[in-house]
């Protein structure tokens, strides 16, 4: 049976409610976990209380993205190595407080003044450091490709690039976050990719393409893809990360149909 979690990030599921109230609505809708990108400006004790109150799990959250809008991480910046290590420590402290077993480390947006190979090697070194630091905490480090239309300049846009990065990092405490929406926009070939690489995927996010709304509003056959994941006994969380058309509750028809089918 697939496990579904709700993305409570800005503009995503249950955004019509204040942040901490979204946990209650997610639990009432049948989700077993939540995720959101950046908890750093929130009251962590209040989040922990919301998780305990609702019985939800914290599936994952991101390492800090940095101070520049659109930055998507400092992992590629050789001048920010010390700051990156501080960010890892901070994220691991919060992960311990929230009993969160995964942290997502974005690769960053290209820095035009720095050669690509320098940025790439910085990412490799930083990811290895993060993965090693996370071992004692029982936290796995994830990487995620993002499509170049939504995030221009982002350094990982395909599954192949992300897997190459993980191979070069060479640490067993790393895995791939596969976002079905970003993958469809960037490269397509969803089914073949899942079949070939599901053993390296620890977490899945989804939205329909091309407009990032709920399943059934675009070009992706989610009934088929979810069936593939079910057949393969995928054990990670599957988290819708979309902008609902209508209310969030109205947008969850696809989930109710799937759970009834199960």
Role assignments for model-derived ranges:
Residues 43, 68, 112, 144, ...:
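Generic structural signal for helix capping and beta-alpha/helix-loop junctions
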Residues 35-54, 62, 107-115, 150, ...:
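Glycine-rich, proline-tolerant flexible connector loops at the mouths of alpha/beta enzymes
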Residues 24, 48-49, 93, 132, ...:
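Alpha-helical segments flanking ligand/cofactor-binding loops in enzyme cores
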Residues 1-11, 60-75, 107-111, 146:
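N-terminal small/glycine-rich loop or linker at the start of catalytic domains
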Residues 1-30, 40, 99-101, 156-178, ...:
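Histidine-acidic metal/acid-base catalytic patches
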Residues 74-175:
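Active-site acidic/histidine proton-transfer and metal-coordination neighborhood
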Residues 27, 52, 96, 131, ...:
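Anion (oxyanion) recognition and catalysis
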Residues 35, 59-62, 104, 142, ...:
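Conserved beta-strand positions in the central sheet of alpha/beta enzyme cores
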């Amino acid at each position: 049976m697939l496990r579904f979690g709700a993305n409570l990030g800005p503009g995503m599921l249950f955004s019509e409610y204040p942040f901490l109230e979204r946990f209650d609505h997610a639990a009432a809708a049948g989700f077993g976990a939540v995720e959101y990108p950046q908890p750093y400006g929130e009251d962590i004790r209040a989040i922990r209380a919301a998780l305990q109150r609702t019985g939800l799990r914290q599936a994952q959250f991101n390492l800090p993205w940095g101070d520049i809008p659109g930055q998507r991480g400092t992992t590629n910046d050789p001048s920010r190595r010390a700051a990156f290590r501080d960010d890892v420590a901070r994220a691991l402290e919060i992960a311990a407080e929230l009993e969160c077993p995964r942290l997502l480390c974005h690769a960053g947006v290209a820095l035009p003044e720095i050669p690509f190979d320098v940025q790439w090697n910085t990412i490799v070194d930083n990811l290895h450091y993060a993965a090693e630091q996370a071992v004692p905490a029982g936290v796995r480090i994830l990487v995620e490709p993002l499509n170049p239309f939504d995030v221009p300049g982002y350094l990982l846009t395909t599954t192949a690039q992300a897997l190459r990065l993980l191979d070069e990092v060479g640490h067993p405490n790393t895995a791939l976050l596969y976002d079905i929406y970003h993958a469809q926009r960037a490269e397509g070939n969803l089914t073949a990719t899942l079949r070939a690489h599901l053993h390296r995927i620890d977490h899945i996010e989804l939205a329909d393409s091309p407009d990032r709304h709920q399943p059934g509003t675009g070009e992706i056959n989610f009934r088929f893809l979810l069936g593939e994941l079910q057949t393969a006994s995928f054990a990670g969380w599957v988290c819708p990360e979309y902008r609902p058309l209508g209310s969030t509750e109205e947008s969850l028809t696809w989930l109710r149909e799937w759970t009834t089918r199960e």
